[in-house]
């Protein structure tokens, strides 16, 4: 396995090369030409509801997440009995939803829309947000979005932890 130092060097080289050739770094692990972003991936990052089909697939409806059985044989047996092949689910709390907005939003170059946080006033500590922005000089607020700038994607996990409630 390459060392963390090599990973960082390769990330920076890749970022520079793709940027110089007209690619936009629109989310933590993806680049695209202008207006050619992957809508499928953005659907997940932007926390839009989705239904998935097949063994081990996960679905999400803004309030809960559920997943199907892993085994293809079991999946087929459920369908043969005209039953849903759901193995489990989790109901998402307000805290879970807030943290998912933070976690997913920071992975997008556009960042987190401050308007998306309006329903979570109980979890928002403006002093904490200001402190995190000061701590990480790769974070800023542009057009009412908290976003990662420059090579801040290298630190997104640590930044996310600092903002979690």
Predicted stretch roles:
Residues 121-135:
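Short amphipathic alpha-helical interaction segments
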Residues 72-75, 102, 129, 133, ...:
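Generic structural signal of hydrophobic/aromatic residues within well-ordered alpha-helices
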Residues 20, 134, 164-165:
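Short, Lys/Arg-enriched, disordered terminal segments
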Residues 1-121:
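C-terminal scaffold of the Radical SAM
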Residues 151-165:
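Short, amphipathic alpha-helical interaction segments positioned at domain boundaries
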Residues 145-149:
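Minor-groove-contacting beta-hairpin "wing" of winged helix-turn-helix DNA-binding domains
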Residues 134-144:
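A short, conserved structural fragment
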């Amino acid at each position: 396995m390459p060392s963390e130092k090599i990973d960082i060097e390769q990330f920076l080289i890749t970022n520079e090369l793709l940027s110089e050739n007209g690619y936009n770094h629109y989310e933590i692990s993806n680049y695209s030409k202008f207006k050619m972003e992957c809508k499928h991936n953005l659907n997940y990052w932007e926390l839009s509801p989705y239904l998935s089909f097949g063994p081990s697939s996960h679905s999400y409806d803004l309030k809960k997440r559920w997943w199907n059985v892993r085994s293809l044989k079991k999946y087929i047996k459920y369908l043969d009995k005209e039953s849903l092949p759901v193995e489990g689910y989790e109901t998402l709390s307000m805290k879970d939803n807030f943290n998912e907005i933070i976690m997913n939003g920071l992975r997008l170059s556009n960042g987190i829309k401050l308007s998306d946080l309006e329903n979570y006033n109980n979890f928002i500590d403006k002093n904490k947000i200001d402190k995190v922005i000061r701590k990480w000089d790769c974070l800023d607020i542009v057009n009412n979005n908290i976003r990662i700038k420059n090579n801040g994607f290298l630190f997104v996990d640590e930044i996310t932890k600092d903002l979690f409630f």
